[in-house]
Design a protein with these regions (language model features):
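Negatively charged
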Residues: 17-125
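Sec-dependent N-terminal signal peptides
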Residues: 4-14
Length: 125
């Protein structure tokens, strides 16, 4: 019985201690904070947003310029749910290292991909 109570308490704590949700209003700041400490992998687990590959970006609609000029960035963000995104313009522009698979992304809502990979020389997926 004590073990069940302890497990229930741990579950409640872990559910209440979640990471800050990623939205249009904070995604640029979240990227800046994360990549200031982990510029290549985005594995900033200790940040309030958690590690970048694990972010829930399902409510984000604008990812335009998100990784613009991030020359070293090459995080695996293939699991992101980008189905709500409408703007991905210049998202990886002038990013010379990014080369991760994005083939499973649902980009059916995207209306602007202008220069999304402009001068992103390493991208070959």
């Amino acid at each position: 019985m004590k073990r069940l109570i302890l497990l229930s308490a741990l579950l409640m704590f872990s559910l209440s201690y979640g990471q800050t949700p990623i939205t249009d209003s904070n995604i640029a700041q979240a990227v800046e904070i994360c990549l200031s400490t982990h510029p290549v992998t985005g594995m900033c687990s200790d940040s309030e947003y958690g590690a970048m590959p694990d972010w829930d970006v399902s409510s984000v609609t604008n990812m335009g310029n998100l990784f613009l000029n991030r020359n070293d960035f090459n995080a695996d963000i293939s699991a992101w749910d980008v189905s709500s995104v409408t703007d991905m313009s210049k998202m990886f522009r002038h990013n010379y290292a990014f080369n991760q698979p994005l083939g499973d992304w649902d980009v059916s809502s995207v209306t602007d991909m202008n220069r999304m990979f402009g001068n992103a020389g390493a991208f070959n997926q």
